[in-house]
Amino acid sequence: MTSSKEEMPDEMVSREVEEEMEDRVEETATTAAACTGCAQLHKDIRQDVSKMMSKIDEVCGRLEALISEKEKVLLEQMSESGSEEKYPPSPTESRASPSSVGKSNGGCRKRKPTKESVNRHLENGGSDSPFEKITRNISTPVSASSPFPDFQNFNGFVFDPMANPQNMMNLLNLVQQQQHQAAAHHHAQQQAREQKPVKAEESKQQEPSENRNQSPSASVEQTLLDQLSMQFNGKSPSPTVHASTAAAAGSSEDDTSANSSISKCSNCSTIKTTAWRRDLEGKLVCNACGLYYRLHRTHRPVHMRKDFIQQRFRRRMREDENPATSQAAVFSQLLGLPSMANGGANALTFLEQINQLNQSQEQRKSP
């Protein structure tokens, strides 16, 4: 009897559940058949939610990929530089293990070492790891690119020059050698540049030396000076003085004519002028032609050419007004001039000046 009583409520419960399920199915069917807009709305919402979930999954995947790539790049940089303490840890490592921050900053120069780093160093027996040895042996780019063999030991010189004075002395010696080589090279270039003008000057000096050999000797110049001093002292000059002065005047005229024949006006073909000028084309013209063209903007006519130089009349001054023109003043001026041993041309020019002074004095004395 008891078993039959227990089976009866179980059957009743199962029947009630089945009836409830059937009622719900009927309700859903009636609602679906009654409202199609709600069904379409639910469908669109499901599609949008699925799209959003897929996009969120893609973003998460990309973030994980970027984080992993960044960690790889940091590890590569740390392996190349050989110092794991220069770069901060990644955010994932700091979140996962906070103790790693203390480990990474344990061996920093600017901070006090932690107990963990000190204990780890003591456990290793104070010996460096093979990774640190390798990083120490790696040469810097400066030492690798340096042409000097001893420059590889200068890694610590930049920070502390007194720690390795031998390397510092080697560097100073190398710098001095480079400076000496540069100075020698510069000196050689200057000598090569100076050789060309020196050769030109030597060739120019040879020509006047030949002309000097043809000039009168120093003894002849001394005799001329003696005769001049006798003339100023009041003694009558010997006939040799007149001959020498005439010869000197003739030779000076020949020299002036030879020198002036080189210069010639391109407009009027004159060879005597107070100053030489250049026209617009760069040709050589006399002073008169140049001034005429500047004033009238036309070339000077040929019929206006003059073979002599026109001089303005100047007021003649007496000897009292101008004592510098007296014989004593002229003689003292001649004695104060430079020596006559440089060449015969200087003596000839002095003779011409003396003749001109004598002529001017005679003209003043004449009524």
Swiss-Prot record:
Annotated Polar residues bias: 92-103, 211-243
Xref: Pfam families: GATA
GO molecular function list: DNA-binding transcription factor activity, RNA polymerase II-specific; RNA polymerase II cis-regulatory region sequence-specific DNA binding; RNA polymerase II transcription regulatory region sequence-specific DNA binding; zinc ion binding
SMART domains recorded: ZnF_GATA (SM00401)
Entry keywords, A to Z: Metal-binding, Nucleus, Transcription, Transcription regulation, Zinc, Zinc-finger
Disruption-associated phenotype: RNAi-mediated knockdown at day 5 of adulthood (earlier RNAi treatment causes worms to become sick) causes extended longevity and also increases expression of elt-3 in the trunk hypodermis; longevity effect is suppressed in an elt-3 mutant background. RNAi-mediated knockdown at the L1 stage has little effect on the average number of seam cells per side, but the number is reduced in an egl-18 mutant background. RNAi-mediated knockdown at the embryonic or L3 stages reduces expression of lin-39; expression is reduced further in an egl-18 mutant background.
One GO cellular component term: nucleus
CDD domains assigned to the protein according to its UniProt record, in alphabetical order: ZnF_GATA (cd00202)
Source organism superkingdom: Eukaryota
Subcellular location: Nucleus
Residue ranges covered by zinc fingers (GATA-type): 265-289
Tissue expression from the record: Expressed in the head.
GO BP term, example: negative regulation of transcription by RNA polymerase II
InterPro entries listed in its UniProt record: Transcription_factor_GATA, Znf_GATA, Znf_NHR/GATA
Biased composition regions of type Basic and acidic residues, renumbered to the chain: 1-16, 114-123, 193-210
Residue ranges, annotated region (Disordered): 1-24, 74-134, 177-264
PANTHER family reported for this sequence: TRANSCRIPTION FACTOR ELT-6, TRANSCRIPTION FACTOR GATA FAMILY MEMBER
Function of the molecule: Transcription factor. Binds to the sequence 5'-TGATAA-3' in regulatory elements of target genes, such as lin-39. Involved in embryonic development and in vulval development in larvae, acting redundantly, at least in part, with egl-18. Perhaps acting together with egl-18, may form a positive feedback loop to initiate and maintain lin-39 gene expression to ensure proper vulval precursor cell (VPC) fate specification. Together with egl-18, acts as a downstream target of the Wnt/beta-catenin asymmetry pathway, required to adopt or maintain the seam cell fate.
UniProt name for this protein: Transcription factor elt-6
Organism: Caenorhabditis elegans
Gene that encodes the chain: elt-6
